[in-house]
């Protein structure tokens, strides 16, 4: 289909993650695919619980509106089971990437069994204990974010450390949400780094520590978005902190990972691989 002639100088393309459930699967797989096209600017939207024709029609309106605005066919990643709802979504002006249809067809061909075709079966089979593990892990990550409540570190599976704005919080939450890992995180301050040793709160939990490293240029850019023109976001300060923290990682024997060019999904997966931590869910 020919693109509309609109003012979209940056060629931003909209990507939708749509599901009749939480949309976590559609979003996770979709973002993994989009990450392979780093040069393309995407605006993403998540539409969960599109489980009836009325909601599907609303999704179609949003997709068509994005097409009218961008002049480019939106990419639609969906995990919708119902053929009727899927057909309605497919009627939109979009490039539809159905994540179930092709896979279910292959499984049916291999097993010789036709799929039920009912939405929600995956959710019916979810173990309530798995749900509890996920929620407990998320609560733990939130309660133990940014050095809060260090008295609970005995219950942590892992404690992420690093300088301010190095990705500790999003990684902790992703580990909790996707894998049920109880992840705390602790920022090493300038005072900690000047002492060239671990803070007292971390010493007895040294075996749980994992360090994040971020490129100085990347760190400057992130901090400038928060406090432009400050000493905190200056190149000299960021470089000094990075050198100091890498020295601590080395002297204390703390495993670490350079996360400068990684997505949070990649960071979390690499951490599990490097530490041998076992996921509690998934």
From Swiss-Prot:
Function in brief: Bifunctional serine/threonine kinase and phosphorylase involved in the regulation of the phosphoenolpyruvate synthase (PEPS) by catalyzing its phosphorylation/dephosphorylation.
Catalytic activity entry: [pyruvate, water dikinase] + ADP = [pyruvate, water dikinase]-phosphate + AMP + H(+); [pyruvate, water dikinase]-phosphate + phosphate + H(+) = [pyruvate, water dikinase] + diphosphate
Taxonomic source organism: Psychrobacter arcticus (strain DSM 17307 / VKM B-2377 / 273-4)
Assigned protein family: Belongs to the pyruvate, phosphate/water dikinase regulatory protein family. PSRP subfamily.
Gene Ontology molecular function terms on file: ADP binding; ATP binding; phosphotransferase activity, phosphate group as acceptor; protein serine/threonine kinase activity
Enzyme Commission code: 2.7.11.33, 2.7.4.28
Pfam families named in the record: Kinase-PPPase
InterPro entries attached to this UniProt entry: Kinase-pyrophosphorylase, PSRP
Domain of life of the native organism: Bacteria
UniProt name for this protein: Putative phosphoenolpyruvate synthase regulatory protein
Amino-acid positions noted as binding ADP in the UniProt annotation, renumbered to this chain: 162-169
Keywords: Kinase, Nucleotide-binding, Serine/threonine-protein kinase, Transferase
